[in-house]
A protein has these predicted regions:
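Short acidic/glycine-rich loops and adjacent helix/strand connectors
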Residues: 1-202
Length: 202
């Protein structure tokens, strides 16, 4: 009723709530990549923080049809892993991820082995995060003291701490891991569904 009343406020002629359609978050992402493309068939890989529960999905698009085939669910999320490092390097979560990505070329990926203690990456690119290092599922911060101890520093406070080579190397390392996962996922789903075209969304 609340939604119906809000719609009536915007459109006095609105009569019924029967036509309201809530589209799945990841299906919407996949549609935004596949349907505007020139492709008649493609496998669509979507990765983000979290939709309803899905964090990574594989869909197959053919002509005007799109079907999600498999999902990875919260709290295992490549997007939230990236956001955890956004937080750790002193940038704002859900807006500063581009800064972390922009910082990556200035560093060296020397912390990849340590990051792999946080995430179990399978050969097909699927993954699971070790929740012992994170707070985002249960707390008010992205990471915790175990995460800090792994890398030897607390999260950077942007109010009084400058970006150092350490933060550049951290950024480079998480970028490297993110790319490794996306490449493995892309190769495995291309092989599994025997479709050469790939759309990315998220």
């Amino acid at each position: 009723n609340l939604l119906f009343n809000k719609l009536k406020e915007h459109d006095k002629n609105y009569k019924s709530d029967k036509n309201i359609y809530f589209s799945d978050h990841h299906l919407s992402h996949a549609a935004s990549a596949f349907f505007p493309s020139p492709l008649e068939e493609a496998v669509v890989l979507t990765a983000d923080g979290v939709g309803e529960w899905a964090t990574t999905t594989v869909a197959v698009g053919k002509n005007n049809k799109l079907e999600i085939k498999k999902e990875i669910h919260f709290p295992h999320s490549l997007g939230l892993l990236y956001s955890a490092f956004t937080y750790y390097t002193g940038f704002k979560v859900n807006s500063g991820e581009y800064k972390l990505m922009g910082l990556a070329p200035y560093g060296s990926p020397i912390y990849c082995d340590k990051i792999k203690k946080l995430i179990d990456i399978k050969e097909d690119g699927t993954f699971r995060l070790d929740q012992n290092y994170f707070n985002y599922a249960t707390g008010l911060t992205m990471t915790n003291s175990k995460f800090d101890n792994l890398f030897g520093q607390k999260p950077r406070d942007p109010r009084n701490e400058k970006i150092t080579q350490f933060h550049m190397d951290i950024a480079s390392s998480i970028q490297c891991i993110t790319e490794e996962i996306m490449i493995k996922l892309s190769r495995s789903i291309s092989k599994e569904y025997k479709i050469k075209n790939l759309c990315l969304a998220g």
